Amino acid sequence: MNVLPCSINTLKGLYDLSGVEVGQHFYWQIGGFQVHAQVLITSWVVIAILLGSATIAVRNPQTIPTKSQNFFEYVLEFIRDLSKTQIGEDYGPWVPFIGTMFLFIFVSNWSGALLPRKIVQLPHGELAAPTNDINTTVALALPTSVAYFYAGLTKKGLGYFGKYIQPTPILLPINILEDFTKPLSLSFRLFGNILADELVVVVLVSLVPLVVPIPVMFLGLFTSGIQALIFATLAAAYIGESMEGHH
């Protein structure tokens, strides 16, 4: 007799839970749209850091490289090796894409831990890593999905779609679903890990003295770098898979 009221209360509870936000957020009202200002501000800082670093890297190259030039060359070589390992011999055109993804995510993740959050006073909330917002991670995953299809169609033409009926046509729905779940897994993995890391640090800082959370902060820096590497590696692997065939 009480099943219906309980079901209604459960649905109401789930609806209320769906409106919960983690922390306070500051929005800009532009026309009829709400823009997440915290994400934009930190993203602009990250982009400025990357553009400034790229300008320094190519401004005055030396025959005998300096320490900074050695560092940038090492980063480029690392990205090239990563792309070649996952994509294969046709990795060249994809190095800029994989490199952009890796560097933006890496610097974004670290910005949440290293940039002083009080450096910019906001009416609500504080600055945080762009990647702790689901909109950012989805925006990074969708171009990866587009690149995945583009690489396969460029290499194989319409024959690319034949992979969906391999090894048997019965697997057609599963193979189609697999392609749509790849960007979801990329975005939610990155979002969940970065958000959880920042929440743990915030809670520890509020509960205990500053010295105690420092090891956790260093662990967060390490895991942030690992998350950037995982995202870039999976993106390159998906592109390589679409060019080589179904696995």
From Swiss-Prot:
Protein name as annotated: ATP synthase subunit a, chloroplastic
HAMAP family on file: ATP_synth_a_bact (MF_01393)
Species: Drimys granadensis
InterPro entries xref list: ATP_syn_F0_a_bact/chloroplast, ATP_synth_F0_asu, ATP_synth_F0_asu_AS, F0_ATP_A_sf
Main location: plastid
SUPFAM superfamilies (alphabetical): F1F0 ATP synthase subunit A (SSF81336)
Membrane topology: Multi-pass membrane protein
Keywords: ATP synthesis, CF(0), Chloroplast, Hydrogen ion transport, Ion transport, Membrane, Plastid, Thylakoid, Transmembrane, Transmembrane helix, Transport
Membrane-crossing residue ranges in chain numbering: 38-58, 95-115, 134-154, 199-219, 220-240
Record keyword Transmembrane present: yes
